[in-house]
Amino acid sequence: FRVGAGDLKIGYAGRMIKANAAYYGKQWHLEQIFPIDGLGAKAARDVNHQLHQATAAMSRRKYVKQGEYIPNFAMIDQHGEFLQIRQLQGKPFVLNFIFTRCTIPTMCPASSIRMADMQDAAREAGLNGLQFVSITFDPAFDSPGILNQYADGYGMESKNFHLLTMNQTVVDDLLRQFGILTMEEDGTINHTMATLLVDTNGRVAYRKEGATWSTKDFMEAATKLLLK
């Protein structure tokens, strides 16, 4: 089987995976590779079951606003590792939603450029504790391997940048929790946008709606958190 560059980089040697097999170009290919093994997988199921129950009980107009705490959730990062968001507790992080097939320059591509620029700015400013989290809208396409390639394409350094994917149920729960609206139309995903700065205790310290947020505003807010 042939695999994509991102999956090849991850490796998955000795791990249990699920994947789709496809035959084209006179070769078999493995696509949509997701790990399904280990304690991380079981913990993720338990955490996300609680997330789903909490989301189902939410009122229609409820979502996480500035000053409120985000729920715990578990996803898989661009290295094929399970991550619970509470593992970042103690470190502030910037969170947004993107999908790799987005073709509107002012939406996901622009947001990812700003996230990568902010990572560079944080490193240059010595704000080494600041983390970055991007969650995909499109888990049907955005496997860990695809996100791995996406990170490389935008120059995102993996040590403190987490690109996350999971099944559609988890993604849908998070979209509702964070007040993001999506609609599939003409082969793409139309969506609203929000970018959040989450403090060391899991509380939203700053939230900006829309696609035109400023890295300067987020850097100023993050600096205040890290220099407290």
Which functions belong to the PLM regions below?
Residues 13, 35-85, 113, 117-120:
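N-terminal "domain-start" segment that seeds a small globular fold
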Residues 20-29, 34:
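Short, charged beta-turn/beta-strand-edge "cap" motif at the junction between a beta-strand
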Residues 22-24, 99-100, 137-138, 156, ...:
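Solvent-exposed coil/turn segments that connect beta secondary-structure elements
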Residues 71, 159-161, 172, 176-196:
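Structural micro-motif
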Residues 71, 83-114:
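Short active-site neighborhood of thiol/selenol oxidoreductases, capturing the structured segment around
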Residues 110-174:
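Structural microenvironment flanking redox-active thiols in thiol-disulfide oxidoreductases
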Residues 120, 181-228:
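Thiol-/selenol-based redox modules, centered on thioredoxin-like
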